[in-house]
Amino acid sequence: MLPRPADVPLPAAIKGLLASLQQGAISAAAYDTAFTARLRAADDPNALAYPQTLGFLLRSQNADGSFGTALPIPKDKLVSTLSALVALADLPQSLQDGAAHRARATALRFVYEDTGNWQTGPDLAGFELVLPALLDEARARELPLPYERFMGISAQRDAKIGHIPPRLIYNVATPLLHSLEYLGNRIDLEAARAQLSPNGSFANSPSATAYFLLRTRDEQANEYIAMLLRNRGDGSLPTVAPFEIFEIAWVLYNLARAGQRPAEAQPLLRYLAQALTDDGVGVSREGLRPDADDTALTLSVLHRYGYPISAGPLRPFEGVSFFFTFPLERDASVSANAHVLEVLQVVPPFPRQHLIQQKVIKYLRDARVDGDHWVDKWHGSPFYATAHAVFALTASAPDLCRPAFTWLKNSQREDGSWGWFGKGTPEETAYAVQALMTAPAETIAAMTEPLARAAAYLNETEAEPVIPLWVGKTLYGPTQVVRSAVLSAQILLARSEHARSAD
């Protein structure tokens, strides 16, 4: 294995970070929590199975009446609020008190007054599936909503699933299982039951699993929900669990970008190596099918830590013009293709290698926004997509990186941060720093003052709560992944400052 540079001590923060992995630290999801709040106790149909979920919902409602993100990201607010409204409408009569009534009234007001822009902003995974299902549920409860505003979304759903034979939903591990709730009353319960993961979930989705439990009883699925609630302790559910492959791979990737390859990572690396198959690897060893993004980043991490790799696990995801993250997806992912390109540049030679690299480079070139930055389907901020595109293109297409460096420099805020949604965040600042530190030496040398402001900002804000910016069925924040990006940026900045001082 590659040694850790002797002149770079391993910070205590990194040791603590590695020790905390595989615990599933992730932000709460009002969308999934609301599905669980609808479940009734097995021995009392007038009592909630998990009353703590209602408490969480009432505590987490935003000041504008919405649920979900507090950022101006309309789709997350919409599906989270509709999910909460259905849960509030389904409460037993004994719980229809003043607090629940006020929450429902303000949420209804939000949907009427503040969702005119619902088609703008980042998309969510499965949005065109789950929104029509939520609207159907709201209509069945006669909730007074502006249904005409959302005309057309059902056609999008039908366009996505119309060509898929229904039997495939239950016979293969497609991404549709992760959004099983889109089936509404059309679910085949026994066919679905056969697709339960060994961990008791449907594709590691609490909301899909709770949806199933609303229609039938299943001890294994119920224990999956109960275990998550016990482990979290605040009455909330996340949008995905478990996700340990994703967490380990992204954390080790961020550390490696800062030159950190600690010996303490070896058990985690062995876990990744054992999980990787000829068909790739997914977010977790169980529950979700392999995908190109987790496969590519796992390969990249293993290579960076000295493990032999090949391009074989990426072959199932190759398309005509780019690499697919999942089957059936509508749009390609910039970051997934960037991660694939990183791997293609370091694996042993194989037939068509150069042609495939050029295909991915062309896709990334064509995917630029305004010729100087990128956006991605798996993260709400363009600073993530741009950073990861730059990481891949620096060696193979540096001409595409120069405009991105200029865009990044010009996007910094006065307080030293970067942020896309109204204010800066430590996470987005970390990505901007990581990307800028791959620039030519003369570019970095000319940024002494901006980088010093970025370092000061990160030092002041590193303990702030993680703001969910990652995109699943709702926005989420993988705590340790974000922490690792910030640590990586801080190490890079400290090393750069040390180098300047030595000069």
Can you say where each PLM-predicted feature lies in the sequence?
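An alpha-helical repeat/solenoid feature that recognizes helix-turn-helix modules
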Residues: M1-P5, Q22-Q52, T69-G98, N117-E181, ...
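Helix-turn-helix repeat elements of alpha-solenoid scaffolds
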Residues: D7-A12, L183-R186, Q220, I309-A311, ...
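Repeat-mediated protein-protein interaction surfaces in helical alpha-solenoids
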Residues: A13-S20, L183-L196, G233
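Buried hydrophobic core positions in alpha-solenoid tandem helical repeats
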Residues: L17-L18, L57, A107, V111, ...
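Short, small/polar-rich motifs associated with maturation and membrane association
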Residues: S60-Q61, N117
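Nucleic acid-processing catalytic cores of prokaryotic defense/repair systems
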Residues: G65-F67
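Short, conserved phosphate-binding/catalytic loop or strand-edge motifs used
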Residues: A105-F110, R270, D293-D294, P316-F322
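Terminal amphipathic helices with adjacent charged low-complexity linkers/tails
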Residues: L229-G235
